[in-house]
């Protein structure tokens, strides 16, 4: 994976439906919210990442991985119906469907809030996946509902109402690293990960990312690990140690 710019900001902010897998004291929760859109329908990009996640779950212990996928006319991952939305979990190289939600909106505050309330824990890592929109700070698109986008107000509204504090909030999306976005997530996370430019279509390398999330016992170690990984990336910019009032 190549990101032209990776922006890492370490912020010193102290920061259940039926059959939901609960995190043990030894597990780190990773929540991935996928607005799959045409990235999945046209090229199966979300499915490729799901396959990376499934493969990685074979070798990685200590992670509770929960994925929401929706907003696409077609889903290419085995066992999923087109134009449906799902909660999935991955463990020991297998994918389990936790919830088939049918055709529901994905780019709305209440949809993200439902996901966070059902599966979130304090100190979890949250990754938001989809198309980024630069200065407008919107994540999209929901191709099932008129290409709706998750706007900044809806995102921060869901984060605030969830009453969760995350270890990391990251965007596997283009152009989501901005002062405006940083200011919005400061109250909710210790670490912000995004790029200010375009991503390649394959986005993040989840085999690598999940291994680092599993093996980093502190935000400082996670930052150092990710900095080392991307140090040779073209035009990398890394910011750490910024203190929030």
What are these regions (language model features)?
Residues 9-18:
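Bacterial N-terminal signal peptides
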Residues 110, 117-121, 125, 132-135, ...:
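Terminal, contiguous helix-loop blocks that mediate binding/assembly
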Residues 33-37, 131, 174:
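Short strand-loop junctions, especially beta-strand C-caps/beta-turns
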Residues 25-120:
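N-terminal extension/subdomain marker
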Residues 1-7:
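Bacterial N-terminal signal peptides that target proteins for export
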Residues 17-25:
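Sec-dependent signal peptide cleavage junction
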Residues 70, 129-131:
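Beta-hairpin (beta-strand-turn-beta-strand) motif
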């Amino acid at each position: 994976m190549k990101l032209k710019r990776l922006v890492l900001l370490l912020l010193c902010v102290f920061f259940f439906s039926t059959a939901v897998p609960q995190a043990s004291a030894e597990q780190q929760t990773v929540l991935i919210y996928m607005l799959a859109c045409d990235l999945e329908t046209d090229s199966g990009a979300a499915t490729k990442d799901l396959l990376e996640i499934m493969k990685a779950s074979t070798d990685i212990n200590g992670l509770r991985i929960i994925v929401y996928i929706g907003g696409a006319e077609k889903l290419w991952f085995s066992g999923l119906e087109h134009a449906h939305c799902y909660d999935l979990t991955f463990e020991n190289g297998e994918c389990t469907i936790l919830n088939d939600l049918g055709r529901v909106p994905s780019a709305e505050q209440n949809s993200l809030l439902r996901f966070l309330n059902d599966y979130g824990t304090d100190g979890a890592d949250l990754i938001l996946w989809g198309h980024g929109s630069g200065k407008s700070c919107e994540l999209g698109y929901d191709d099932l509902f008129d290409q709706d986008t998750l706007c900044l107000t809806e995102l921060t509204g869901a984060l605030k109402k969830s009453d969760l504090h995350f270890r990391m909030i990251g965007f596997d999306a283009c152009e989501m690293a901005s002062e405006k976005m940083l200011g919005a997530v400061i109250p909710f996370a210790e670490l912000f990960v995004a790029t200010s430019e375009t991503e390649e279509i394959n986005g993040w390398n989840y085999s690598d990312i999940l291994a680092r999330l599993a093996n980093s016992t502190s935000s400082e170690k996670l930052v150092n690990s990710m900095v080392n990984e991307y140090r040779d990336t073209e035009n990398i910019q890394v910011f750490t140690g910024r203190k929030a009032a």
